[in-house]
């Protein structure tokens, strides 16, 4: 069937901010969709609140709205743009739920907008638990015994019938949010209560526990002629009980018989037909009992999912692209396979290699969080590897995770019998360390049966782990490392670093092993991903390495640039860095062959048709050097870009240069100059720039001396970190001692000598009550171009990645902006930057302080680019390749005059707000972890509010980050520290004028009473040990109080807004319980007075309900017009 001709314009809804369970994979799928629609001549209207996405680039759609994905805003855009159809299946659960809400509100009918990709009925049958159970039954398959509940009373009744353990699964949520496994009534109430809250339909499915069963997934696609293909089967190494996003997964499947696999196919095809997905794809999850073979259907997603992105990258079959074509009316047999260009999409992909995905976690960012892996997803990113066998693929994937333990470790002494027993007990509870525990137990003598009984991991995988250990022991014990043994080690997935450790070769061991390997002529070869197990020739150069005989690399003629990506998403290094890499690829591809190296299956950069060559490889020194050596033989290489992918590639710069690899842009020496505190301090002194007083320390004594010289409070952090890892504000000697002792315990044991750390701690004076500013800039060696000046809405002390900020700045004077510009130019020259740089400043009492400079792309580059209409990363890539800023003005990449530091009258305002994952992380007794923000970054994503002035833009940013946005009336709870009480009366008067009733603790209420402001008194909470069930919360009744504390009032739904500024040690104060309860109830809460002043302005804007919706294409034209007028006015003034 040919494409439908009645669809002229389509609205695509994105997935919004990066959150756990819904990450960069939807930027990948959304970008694919937009490209397909435009290629087909369809006008594209895109809505997404996340500026750090390629899909929100102006060239991806005809009209791009970086606005909240809420029904009122979406209706405004639909009314303005009048699309023929809405495509919601490529924006995750957010887009699907938004489409359902638009349908229920009558908006789709009112404006005659057709839903394509999936009907409302199909969405309901796939997402609603009860409806889906019926579909499964009609398909002749089995679900786990279960029942639906909407209240805790109904939950208890089901528990009485089924007994424990029970699985709770909410309807219409993603990433298993609100789900969990309950082993008793208390756990059941906690999990089910959260599930009912997070489900938009207040519905949970309670099902019998099937922990320990084997788990599989199928990715399927179906067209309107009822053709169905199974794109990829995926096997979870972890058994049922661990969310598939937190499990190691592999393709193809290894532990199914052909008969079992065919049974899963038959069930999957019957279900996709029964649900009614007839123009797109879906993901179905199954469980199989390891002994009886009983098959249970767990759930399905009637949309492109996280697993779809993994399956696409694993097979080379672009699911999102094909789903979009199916939504336009094509059938599978009419769509060409891009990789072979000779087979249709109705040919099911076949793979002759092994794909392994390993999750990346960030528990270290959330002290007190329960590290147990359950049915609610907790990983923040993932890495994928391809190789010739499972062992090699697993080894590559584990070192791609980029953590301190790069895969399995056999360091130290062989575990004793007692330690093995302890390890077997520990691995019964799944955590991120389970596989390291398994390998250590095997090394210590555990049997396969013991490992299986403790983990329920399939015996086939356990046997693979035993084989890896056996190879490691051969390497460890051999007198000499023969070529044959070294090759065997490589086929077992062991890196040069691991082999060096096994051989006890010390610091230079990796280089020693590499030299030996190269002397033996042992190099990996590079194979092509072709979708068909080499049955047809692949036209797309999409490569992976393995230790085999024949390489499939082809010669090239053009000079090449290698761009190193950022690896798996993690807090502090996320999608923003992939955005800059993709821009570099797009721009440099005009003049060079672009070679992308990355290992993240979620990203746009690992789309096989984004770069000229794609290497799906770990970002380690060994793997990158092998790619460089292989590519050098295929054609000329201009150099490698390490500046755009964050700290991971940046940390390789010096070693790559030492190995003879040319580095483009800022040199490794200049990178070290900016990162080294003493050297950078000298640059600042020469340029007469202020910095907070600082010192460095390798021991507790040195740290104490530095802190006393500087004066408390101080900011303490390790050197060379991203995302404020390990950063803390310290107020006294006791807190400092705790910090240093923790740093010593976390350092590798063999690097700590006599209580001294291997690398110094940095200790800075903490600037209280200062305004913090981020500046992104380009420098070509002569000229500076300011990309954007972003003023933080919170005062200094909150990590820049977590802080809300505004562009243009809202309170800085022209003189302050001039001083920022001059300081940035001086630092760029002093650090010899070439390309992008980011400098963080603070104004305290109008004195400018330099906090730090980063000679690389920062996480604010996408936001600054969208707010100013300038593709900063594209211009930076050309500057790194040797061009000038003047050339970028001439070719249209940069503004022809002026830059992002100029503030124009009438300019639209952009506000960036962070999105935090706290509702995912709970303590072992079920409380959410503390949300109090500080110098260590904890956000996973961001949103952008964009409107005519700051109040409206900030209000949009809150609407995009809080479900429902800011309240316009109701009850506001206030509890502020003594320092903030002087500002409080003005805030309180405004709240009363806006129609709020104030509820406050006794101390705050008495301050308000002195100013004639009435408030309801709420009991205070005293929590001795928040996470200890032996010490429950005690309540102290205040005179004249309502008789309840604020936590009870929040749980009863009586509080609509919270202002809670903690004291200097906030995280252990009463505030913790308040903040934890507010997260669970999804109530907007603010912990600084400066941000709350912005909230008051925003509430006024919300009450007016006169938001503007402006596409970024319109905004860009407006900015250029403002710049032109400004230039003309300047020329006229000079002429006079």
UniProtKB/Swiss-Prot annotation:
Binding-site residues, Mg(2+) 4: 852, 854
Residues that, per the record, bind Mg(2+) 1: 285, 299
InterPro entries in UniProt: ATP-grasp (IPR011761), CarbamoylP_synth_lsu (IPR006275), CarbamoylP_synth_lsu_oligo (IPR005480), CarbamoylP_synth_lsu_oligo_sf (IPR036897), CbamoylP_synth_lsu-like_ATP-bd (IPR005479), CbamoylP_synth_lsu_CPSase_dom (IPR005483), MGS-like_dom (IPR011607), MGS-like_dom_sf (IPR036914)
Cystine crosslinks: none
Region of interest (Carboxyphosphate synthetic domain), residue spans: 1-402
Residues holding Mg(2+) 2: 299, 301
EC numbers for this chain: 6.3.4.16, 6.3.5.5
Protein name according to UniProt: Carbamoyl phosphate synthase large chain
Pfam (any one): MGS
Sites where the protein binds Mn(2+) 4: 852, 854
GO biological process: 'de novo' UMP biosynthetic process; glutamine metabolic process; L-arginine biosynthetic process
Binding-site residues, Mg(2+) 3: 840, 852
Gene Ontology annotations for the cellular component aspect, listed alphabetically: cytoplasm
Residue span of region Carbamoyl phosphate synthetic domain: 552-962
Keyword Cytoplasm: no
UniProt cofactor note: Binds 4 Mg(2+) or Mn(2+) ions per subunit.
Residue ranges occupied by any MGS-like domain in the UniProt entry: 964-1122
Needed cofactors: Mg(2+); Mn(2+)
Binding residues for ATP 1: 129, 169, 175-176, 208, 210, 215, 241-243, 285, 299
Family: Belongs to the CarB family.
PROSITE patterns attached to this UniProt entry: ATP_GRASP (PS50975), CPSASE_1 (PS00866), CPSASE_2 (PS00867), MGS (PS51855)
Keywords: Amino-acid biosynthesis, Arginine biosynthesis, ATP-binding, Ligase, Magnesium, Manganese, Metal-binding, Nucleotide-binding, Pyrimidine biosynthesis, Repeat
Protein role: Large subunit of the glutamine-dependent carbamoyl phosphate synthetase (CPSase). CPSase catalyzes the formation of carbamoyl phosphate from the ammonia moiety of glutamine, carbonate, and phosphate donated by ATP, constituting the first step of 2 biosynthetic pathways, one leading to arginine and/or urea and the other to pyrimidine nucleotides.
């Amino acid at each position: 069937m040919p494409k439908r001709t009645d669809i002229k314009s389509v609205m695509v809804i994105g997935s919004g901010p990066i959150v756990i369970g819904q990450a960069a994979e939807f930027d990948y799928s959304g970008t694919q969709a937009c490209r397909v629609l435009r290629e087909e001549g369809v006008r594209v209207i895109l809505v997404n609140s996340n500026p750090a996405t390629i899909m929100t680039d102006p060239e991806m759609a005809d009209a791009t709205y970086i606005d909240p994905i809420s029904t009122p805003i979406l209706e405004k855009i639909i009314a303005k743009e009048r699309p023929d159809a809405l495509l919601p299946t490529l924006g995750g659960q957010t887009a699907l739920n938004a489409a359902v809400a638009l349908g229920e509100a009558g908006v789709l009918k009112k404006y005659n907008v057709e839903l394509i990709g999936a009907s409302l009925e199909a969405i309901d049958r796939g997402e609603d638990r009860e409806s889906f159970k019926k579909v499964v039954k009609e398909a002749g398959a089995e679900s786990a015994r279960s029942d639906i509940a909407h209240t805790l009373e109904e939950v208890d009744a089901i528990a009485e019938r089924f007994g424990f353990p029970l699985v709770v699964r909410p309807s219409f949520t993603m990433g298993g949010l609100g789900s969990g496994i309950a082993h008793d009534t208390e756990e059941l109430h906690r999990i089910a209560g959260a599930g009912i809250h997070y489900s938009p339909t207040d519905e949970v499915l309670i099902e019998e526990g099937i922990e320990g069963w084997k788990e599989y997934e199928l990715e399927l696609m179906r067209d309107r002629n009822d053709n169905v293909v199974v794109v990829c089967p995926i096997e979870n190494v972890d058994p049922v009980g661990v969310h598939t996003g937190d499990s190691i997964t592999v393709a193809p499947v290894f532990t199914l018989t052909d008969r079992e696999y065919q049974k899963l196919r038959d069930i999957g095809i019957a279900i996709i037909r029964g649900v009614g997905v007839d123009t797109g794809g879906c993901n179905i999850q199954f469980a199989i009992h390891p002994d009886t073979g009983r098959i249970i259907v767990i759930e399905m997603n009637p949309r492109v999912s996280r697993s779809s992105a993994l399956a696409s990258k694993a097979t080379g079959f672009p699911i999102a692209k094909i789903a979009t074509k199916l939504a336009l009316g094509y059938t599978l047999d009419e769509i060409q396979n891009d990789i072979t260009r000779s087979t249709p999409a109705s040919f099911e992909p076949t793979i002759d290699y092994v794909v392994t995905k390993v999750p990346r976690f960030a528990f270290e960012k959330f002290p007190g969080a329960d590290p147990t892996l359950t049915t609610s997803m907790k990983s923040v990113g993932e890495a994928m590897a391809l190789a010739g066998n499972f062992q090699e693929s697993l080894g590559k994937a584990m070192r791609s995770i980029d953590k301190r333990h790069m895969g399995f470790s056999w360091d130290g002494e062989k575990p004793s019998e007692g330690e093995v027993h302890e390890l077997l007990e520990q691995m019964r509870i799944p955590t991120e360390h389970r596989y390291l525990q398994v390998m250590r137990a095997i090394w210590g003598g555990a049997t396969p049966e013991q490992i299986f009984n403790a983990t329920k991991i399939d015996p086939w995988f356990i046997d693979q782990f035993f084989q890896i250990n056996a190879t490691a022991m051969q390497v460890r014990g051999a007198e000499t490392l023969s070529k044959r043994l070294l090759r065997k080690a490589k086929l077992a997935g062991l890196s040069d670093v691991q082999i060096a450790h096994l051989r006890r070769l010390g610091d230079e061991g990796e280089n020693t092993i590499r030299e030996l390997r190269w002397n033996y002529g042992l190099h990996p070869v590079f194979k092509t991903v072709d979708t068909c197990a080499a049955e047809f020739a692949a036209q797309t150069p999409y490569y992976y390495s393995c230790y085999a005989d024949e390489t499939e690399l082809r010669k090239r003629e053009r000079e090449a640039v290698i761009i190193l990506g950022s690896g798996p998403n993690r807090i502090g290094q996320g999608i923003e860095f992939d955005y800059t890499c993709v821009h570099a690829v797009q721009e440099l591809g005009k003049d060079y062959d672009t070679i992308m190296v990355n290992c993240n299956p979620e990203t746009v950069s690992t789309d096989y048709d984004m770069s000229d060559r794609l290497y799906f490889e770990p970002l380690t020194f060994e793997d990158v050097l092998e790619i460089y050596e292989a590519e050098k033989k295929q054609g000329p290489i201009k150099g490698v870009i390490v500046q755009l992918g964050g700290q991971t590639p940046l940390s390789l710069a010096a070693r790559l240069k030492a190995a003879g690899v040319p580095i483009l842009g800022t040199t490794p020496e200049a990178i070290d100059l900016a990162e080294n505190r003493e050297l950078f301090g000298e640059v600042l002194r020469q340029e007469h720039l202020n910095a907070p007083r600082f010192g460095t320390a390798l021991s507790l004594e040195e740290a104490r001396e530095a802190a006393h010289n500087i004066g408390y409070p101080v900011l303490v952090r390790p050197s060379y970190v991203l995302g404020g890892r390990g950063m803390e504000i310290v107020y006294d000697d006791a807190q400092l001692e705790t910090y240093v002792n923790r740093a010593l315990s976390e350092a590798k044991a063999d690097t700590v000598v006599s209580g001294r750390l291997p690398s110094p701690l940095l200790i800075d004076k903490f600037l209280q009550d200062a305004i913090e500013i981020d500046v992104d800039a380009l420098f070509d060696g002569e000229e500076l171009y300011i990309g954007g000046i972003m003023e933080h809405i919170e005062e200094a002390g909150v990590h820049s990645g977590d802080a809300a900020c505004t562009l243009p700045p809202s309170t800085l004077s022209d003189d302050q902006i001039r001083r920022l510009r001059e300081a940035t130019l001086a630092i760029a020259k002093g650090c010899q930057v070439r390309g992008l740089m980011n400098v963080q400043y603070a104004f305290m009492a109008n004195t400018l302080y330099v906090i730090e400079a980063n000679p690389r792309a920062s996480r604010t580059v996408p936001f600054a680019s969208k707010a100013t209409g300038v593709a900063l990363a594209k211009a930076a890539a050309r500057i790194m390749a040797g061009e000038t800023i003047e050339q970028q003005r001439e070719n249209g990449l940069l503004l022809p005059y002026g830059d992002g530091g100029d503030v124009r009258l009438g300019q639209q305002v952009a506000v960036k707000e962070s999105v935090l994952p706290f509702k995912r992380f709970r303590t072992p007794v079920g409380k959410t972890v503390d949300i109090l923000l500080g110098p260590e970054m904890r956000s996973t994503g961001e949103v952008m509010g964009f409107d005519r002035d700051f109040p409206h833009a900030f209000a949009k940013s809150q609407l995009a980050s809080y479900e429902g946005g800011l309240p316009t009336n109701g009850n506001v709870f206030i509890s502020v520290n003594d320092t903030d009480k002087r500002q409080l009366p003005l805030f309180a008067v405004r709240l009363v004028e806006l129609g709020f009733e104030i509820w406050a603790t006794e101390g705050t209420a008495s301050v308000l009473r002195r100013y004639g402001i009435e408030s309801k008194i709420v009991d205070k909470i005293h929590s001795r040990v928040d996470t200890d069930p032996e010490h429950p919360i005690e309540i102290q009744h205040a005179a004249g109080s309502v008789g309840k504390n604020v936590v009870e009032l929040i749980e009863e739904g009586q509080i609509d807004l919270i202002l809670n500024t903690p004291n200097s040690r906030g995280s252990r104060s009463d505030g913790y319980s308040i903040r934890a309860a507010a997260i669970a109830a999804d109530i907007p809460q603010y912990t600084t007075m400066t941000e709350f002043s912005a909230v008051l302005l925003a509430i006024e804007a919300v009450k007016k309900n006169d938001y503007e919706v402006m596409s970024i294409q319109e905004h860009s034209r407006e900015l250029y017009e403002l710049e032109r007028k400004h230039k003309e006015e300047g020329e006229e003034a000079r002429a006079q």
